[in-house]
């Protein structure tokens, strides 16, 4: 098990990457965006979905996750990462997992016009996906309601619940 890593989880558009960058800016932490790591090694996630499918993507997502550092890193997971059982187990067993929670309507406003591969399925299907994934996200140790909150406040909340209380890094 990866010790003392901090996991940011949430649906597409929840701001995982933005919050990750804000945390790095505030405390100069080691940070990794899982999707960015995948794109560096394998190319565009959109293209992977289009040419090889979601199952192939989830396999390389797991492979990339397993290659991550074992400790003291803030990691933004992909929106569907918790569908991979090994990744879900790591997050469930971590005291430092944070679900960035928002309403589907707010998230849809942020992603509706994006190039994300799953968005092409339409609002109704994505709403169903959100409901399914929400059960996975809710297994995080900490749930942060991000509705109408600034990125800096969200990042500071995560920092206060890790560095100060648990003295992780």
Regions found by a protein language model. Give the residues of each.
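P-loop (Walker A) phosphate-binding loop of NTP-binding proteins
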Residues: 11
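ATP-dependent small-molecule kinase phosphotransfer cores
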Residues: 36-89
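Short glycine-rich anion-binding loops that position phosphate/pyrophosphate groups of nucleotides
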Residues: 78-82, 103-105, 149
């Amino acid at each position: 098990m990866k010790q003392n890593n901090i996991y940011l989880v949430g649906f597409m558009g929840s701001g995982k990457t933005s919050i990750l960058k804000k945390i790095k800016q505030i405390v100069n932490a080691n940070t990794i965006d899982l999707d960015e790591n995948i794109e560096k090694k394998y190319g565009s996630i959109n293209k992977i979905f289009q040419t090889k499918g979601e199952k192939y993507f989830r396999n390389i997502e797991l492979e990339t996750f397993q290659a991550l550092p074992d400790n003291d890193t803030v990691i933004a997971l992909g929106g569907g990462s918790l569908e991979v059982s090994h990744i879900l187990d790591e997050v469930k067993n971590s005291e430092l997992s944070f679900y960035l929670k928002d309403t589907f309507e707010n998230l849809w406003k942020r992603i509706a016009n994006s190039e994300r591969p799953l968005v092409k399925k339409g609002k109704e299907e994505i709403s169903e996906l959100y409901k399914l994934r929400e059960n996975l996200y809710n297994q995080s140790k900490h749930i942060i309601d991000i509705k109408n909150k600034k990125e800096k406040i969200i990042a500071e909340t995560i920092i206060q619940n890790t560095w100060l209380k648990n003295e992780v890094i």
